[in-house]
Regions:
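Aromatic-rich, lipid-facing transmembrane alpha helices and their immediate juxtamembrane interface loops
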Residues: 1-134
Length: 134
């Protein structure tokens, strides 16, 4: 997404996460392209939420530190958050579009909304319940 350096740690961790998310296919899920795109959509949104929660849960930083002055490794910011977050959310939605268009628009839109709302609710609860965030 950006020109940030990908470390060995992040490479191995992302591979592990992708393998973990594909685990249901081992247990009798029938693979198809729509299921694959759904897994990738979940992964992309997970990475965005995970990156943000680092600021919420890390005892060495505060949510007050979340901004372009202190978070120098995110080069581009839009509307108060890293541009990568907006790109990730949009890409996560785009990955659901083929299923939404081809299979069932109602179910596809419902899956997108559920994915976004569940992550928003859980992130909001984490911020509200974790005392270091404020």
């Amino acid at each position: 997404m950006t020109d940030k350096e990908l470390t060995g740690y992040h490479s191995v961790l992302n591979i592990f996460l992708l393998l973990f998310l594909h685990w249901p296919f081992v247990w009798n899920w029938h693979w198809n392209v729509f299921e694959e795109l759904e897994i990738l959509s979940i992964f992309v949104l997970f990475v965005v939420v995970w990156d943000f929660l680092w600021f919420v849960l890390n005892p060495g930083v505060s949510l007050r530190d979340f901004g372009p002055k202190r978070v120098w490794w995110h080069k581009k910011w839009k509307a108060g958050v890293p541009a990568d977050y907006w790109s990730g959310i949009l890409f996560s939605i785009v990955l659901f579009l083929p299923e939404t268009i081809v299979v069932d628009p109602i179910i596809g839109i419902a899956k997108i909304l559920i994915l976004l709302l569940v992550n928003l609710i859980l992130t909001t609860l984490t911020i509200a319940l974790y005392p270091k965030a404020y």
